[in-house]
Amino acid sequence: MQNSFFLKEPFVDILEEPKKNSNISSQLIYGESFKIISKKNNYFKIKTSYDKYSGFIKKIDSYKKFNPTHKVGILKARIYLGNKKKKSKKFLPFTSKIQILKRDQNFIMYKKDKWLKSKDIFPVQKKNSDFVKILKSFLNCKYKWGGKT
């Protein structure tokens, strides 16, 4: 199979085995690249392009072609829905890669009817050299084994 894809959901758990109650080995976040190695029941065996983790994910929404222009620069960027930009309960995690489809005042649309605040994103090429500030933003965060969220 070995096709490259990009995650189109906020995040998904990568499981050690192709079953619901399996341990989590890692996570994929929005815009992250992965390859599908094989399919087993309702699961895909995948390998992440960035850190080379492999494991199983349920069938998910993904892009075949994706050219990210920006990334999330805060721990959790709230997702807003529709033209009224209604707050949702979902977030995109830190370093999720997105492509700006549209701009409207202080918001950008990254997916049909899904918006983020402009101040929460930065160009993909921008490097943040203030490591102390980055580290402090992770203080008091709950630890999740294998987690990126």
Predicted features, each with a name:
Residues 95-96, 117, 129-130, 136:
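Glycine- and small hydrophobic-enriched segments that form the cores of compact globular domains
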Residues 22, 51-54, 114-117:
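Short, surface-exposed beta-strand-loop junctions and turns on beta-sheet-rich folds
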Residues 9, 116, 138:
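Residue-level signal for pocket-adjacent positions within structured domains
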Residues 1-18, 27-30, 37-40, 47-50, ...:
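SH3-family beta-barrel domains
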Residues 12, 54, 141-143:
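Flexible, active-site-adjacent loop/turn segments at secondary-structure boundaries
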Residues 132-149:
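Catalytic cores of peptidoglycan-degrading enzymes
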